[in-house]
């Protein structure tokens, strides 16, 4: 398991784990900035495959966030679909020596495409994994679609939300997909399947909470909340879930204002993408209104100077 010596949460002003000082000052890799008494290496998707090369031995802090899952999209009227799960979230400390460490940053999960009956294309895609040292954060799970066979989302760092098939009175409850222990949370559930128009899909899970549930004749479920972290020198939210969509009501709101919002027919709005470089999930689509892709991941390493 890649969670040894990892801590989920924020790095505040008292969280100076590093003792690197002058031993690490010549380290290379990523975009290098300073904030106060810290030197910070930031790796984004365009830098995937590059290395962090430590110039000496010391302790560093890290934040690893995978790519968020894309929102689900169906074709049928009345159906709300599931928001994408956030990318997996890991933070903690690691001891490094004077060597090079491969860094991978996860890409965004693709938005679900408008499916036709039985083609299986409506699911949002899973985000890509991010990794450094011996730790891997798994990509967020794609949001569920109104497939009428399995409306649940896909598993991932945080799981995708489920779709509500509001046009059929015989559809059962559907569960949000599971997240990875230590990295995220499950997607929301659909509490009532079918029985009338206006089913709301559930939100994708976030690093801070499960996705919001969807019900018949409801708004789409909100995306699960992300977690705030100040490792970059500024407190920012990462890994918020994407929101579910609704046919006759409002789409849900993305988690921590970084997850994508869910689509709705009234008012006519598309689902939106998760925020890039934050690993946020994409918002779900509904019928003629698009779903959003997930946000790209990020890896940040810092040490005291």
What kind of feature is each model-predicted range?
Residues 2-305:
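Low-complexity, glycine/proline-biased repetitive segments and flexible coils/loops
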């Amino acid at each position: 398991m890649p969670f040894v010596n990892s801590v989920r949460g924020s790095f505040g002003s008292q969280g100076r784990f590093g003792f690197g000082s002058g031993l690490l000052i010549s380290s290379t890799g990523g975009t290098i900035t300073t904030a106060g008494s810290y030197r910070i290496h930031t790796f984004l998707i365009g830098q995937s495959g590059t290395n962090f090369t430590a110039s000496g031995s010391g302790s560093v802090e890290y934040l690893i966030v995978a790519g968020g899952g894309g929102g689900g999209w169906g074709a049928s009227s009345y159906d709300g679909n599931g928001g994408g799960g956030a990318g997996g979230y890991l933070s903690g400390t690691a001891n490094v020596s004077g060597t090079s460490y491969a860094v991978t940053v996860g890409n965004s999960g693709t938005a679900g495409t408008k499916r036709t009956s039985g083609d299986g294309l409506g699911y949002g895609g899973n985000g890509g994994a991010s990794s450094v040292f011996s730790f891997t954060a798994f990509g967020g799970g794609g949001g569920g679609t109104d497939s009428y066979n399995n409306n649940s989302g896909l598993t991932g760092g945080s799981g995708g939300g489920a779709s509500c098939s509001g046009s059929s009175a015989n559809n059962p409850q559907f569960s949000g997909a599971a997240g990875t222990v230590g990295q995220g949370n499950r997607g929301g559930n659909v509490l009532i399947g079918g029985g009338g128009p206006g089913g709301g899909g559930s939100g994708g899970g976030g690093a801070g909470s499960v996705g919001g549930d969807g019900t018949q004749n409801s708004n789409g479920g909100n995306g699960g909340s992300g977690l705030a972290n100040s490792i970059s020198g500024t407190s920012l939210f990462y890994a918020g879930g994407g929101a579910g969509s609704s046919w006759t009501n409002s789409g849900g709101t993305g988690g921590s204002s970084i997850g994508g919002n869910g689509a709705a027919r009234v008012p006519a709005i598309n689902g939106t993408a998760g925020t890039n470089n934050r690993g946020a999930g994409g918002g779900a689509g509904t019928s003629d209104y698009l779903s959003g892709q997930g946000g790209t991941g990020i890896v940040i390493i810092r040490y005291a100077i």
